[in-house]
UniProtKB/Swiss-Prot annotation:
The active site is at residues 166, 285. PROSITE patterns: RUBISCO_LARGE (PS00157). GO terms for molecular function: magnesium ion binding; monooxygenase activity; ribulose-bisphosphate carboxylase activity. The modification N6-carboxylysine is found at residue 192. Heterohexadecamer of 8 large chains and 8 small chains. The basic functional RuBisCO is composed of a large chain homodimer in a 'head-to-tail' conformation. In form I RuBisCO this homodimer is arranged in a barrel-like tetramer with the small subunits forming a tetrameric 'cap' on each end of the 'barrel'. It catalyses: 2 (2R)-3-phosphoglycerate + 2 H(+) = D-ribulose 1,5-bisphosphate + CO2 + H2O; D-ribulose 1,5-bisphosphate + O2 = 2-phosphoglycolate + (2R)-3-phosphoglycerate + 2 H(+). Substrate binds at residues 114, 164, 168, 286, 318, 370. The keyword Plastid applies. Its EC number is 4.1.1.39. One of its GO terms (cellular component) is chloroplast. This is Ribulose bisphosphate carboxylase large chain.
Length: 466
């Protein structure tokens, strides 16, 4: 007898360890687990820990050649989800040795790569991860971060303004550049390639880059402000992506852009390193995120994708608007906005933050609010997101009845009015509409915008009751 007992044994005998004291170096995960009928939660939780670390479906002879206690994931705590039948939050601790340094790709392949198709589970969602400082320190993180970006742009004390150029597909490069110029001239800080603008037959990437750069330099000369356009470098191969970023750098632009989920974490991390080495800011779009994060009980919550982006690298990331959505979503959106910007985030279950997360000086990421917002939302956005954010008005700029430049003027005037009012100690939540109305007396462009998008009622009371 060699001490090897073949056969299948329950996962919970090895991987469910409720007495385990987590280590400071462990990666901790919170999963929302819905077991199949008849599968006890301990077995389901242990199965998740096993299949995402050292386990397989049967005992194997080679288990004896390693120290499983050192390398196995452990399910160390299970709590039922209030108000849900047969749903549990399962906490799993992974030893740091299971992960390659500086690789978001490897971290995800290990933690979520295999276990989601597991038969014993009906559905599974990764709600949060605690990344230990020992692992955070193996990542470069965002190319520059919030403070360096402000210094590069010479813009302080207010949110930054952006606009996605529409129609997103079909414009020629020259007309696209015209639209960029009008927006920047009117007072925006940035314009943006749509996420699916890459290099299509009607507008090849190189032509677009050249005409957009012409627009940037012309607008800078006229306004005396630094301007940028998020040149989307996303491409079919990593080499082509870097080639586009290199060309952007040669043109002297301040910022490029990447779709980090469709482009992939490996490509994104490479681009992020290139951007830091070459002084480019990196704007990140989250195209495809809803495929992964939309279902409440299956997939990966966006806060995990946001943490992963901060590790992989990006200076801006789209993070929803909060305005007009349900209150619970508001708190949760604020939760991952804080995770993106701050250096140390306390556990706060009301915001969906399952673990205290120290970032040990990893640069922060600016959250980008974009999607269906216009001048009447400005007070709410200023109040909710604060100065360190990018507010992006696509239709809210280009839909102005007088054209792009007046649309940009309207947004800039509204923003400056809100920032001034806030600095004077006024209550943006209560007086928001009044502030915008008053400012529109001095700005015909803003008055016209206010007329088009008529006052909206802010669902804004809940902010104070967090």
């Amino acid at each position: 007898n060699v001490g090897f007992k073949a056969g299948v044994k329950e996962y919970k005998l090895t991987y469910y360890t409720p007495d385990y004291e987590t280590l400071d170096t462990d990666i901790l995960a919170a999963f929302r687990v819905t077991p199949q009928p008849g599968v006890p939660p301990e077995e389901a939780g242990a199965a998740v820990a096993a299949e995402s670390s050292t386990g397989t479906w049967t005992t194997v002879w080679t288990d004896g050649l390693t120290n499983l206690d050192r390398y196995k994931g452990r399910c160390y705590h299970i709590e039922p989800v209030a108000g849900e039948e047969n749903q549990y939050i399962v906490y799993v601790a992974y030893p740091l040795d299971l992960f390659e340094e500086g690789s978001v790709t490897n971290m995800f392949t290990s933690i979520v790569g295999n276990v989601f198709g597991f038969k014993a589970l009906r559905v599974l969602r990764l709600e949060d991860l605690r990344i230990p400082p020992a692992y955070v320190k193996t990542f470069q993180g965002p190319p520059h971060g919030i403070q360096v970006e402000r210094d590069k742009l010479n813009k302080y004390g207010r949110p930054l303004l952006g606009c996605t150029i529409k129609p997103k597909l079909g414009l020629s490069a020259k007309n696209y550049g015209r639209a960029v110029y009008e927006c920047l001239r009117g007072g925006l800080d940035f314009t943006k390639d749509d996420e699916n603008v890459n290099s299509q037959p009607f507008m090849r990437w190189r032509d677009r880059f050249v005409f957009c750069v012409e627009a940037i330099y012309k607008a800078q000369a006229e306004t005396g402000e630094i301007k940028g356009h998020y040149l989307n470098a996303t491409a079919g191969t990593s080499e082509e992506m870097i080639k586009r970023a290199v060309f952007a750098r040669e043109l002297g632009v301040p910022i490029v852009m990447h779709d980090y989920l469709t482009g992939g974490f490996t490509a994104n991390t490479s681009l992020s390193h290139y951007c830091r080495d070459n002084g480019l800011l990196l704007h990140i779009h989250r195209a495809m995120h809803a495929v992964i994060d939309r279902q409440k009980n299956h997939g990966i919550h966006f806060r995990v994708l946001a943490k992963a982006l901060r590790m992989s690298g990006g200076d801006h990331i789209h993070s929803g608007t909060v305005v007009g959505k349900l209150e619970g979503e508001r708190d949760i959106t604020l939760g991952f906005v804080v995770l993106l910007r701050d250096d140390y985030i306390e556990k706060d279950r009301s915001r969906g933050i399952y673990f205290t997360q120290p970032w040990v000086s990893l640069p922060g990421v600016l959250p980008v609010a974009s999607g269906g917002i216009h001048v009447w939302h400005m007070p709410a956005l200023t109040e909710i997101f604060g100065d360190d954010s990018v507010l992006q008005f696509g239709g809210g700029t280009l839909g102005h009845p007088w054209g792009n430049a007046p649309g940009a003027v309207a947004n800039r005037v509204a923003l400056e009015a809100c920032v001034q009012a806030r600095n004077e100690g006024r209550d943006l939540a209560r007086e928001g509409n009044e502030i915008i109305r008053k400012a529109s007396k001095w700005s015909p462009e803003l008055a016209a915008a206010c007329e088009v998008w008529k006052e909206i009622k802010f669902e804004f009371q809940a902010m104070d009751t967090l």
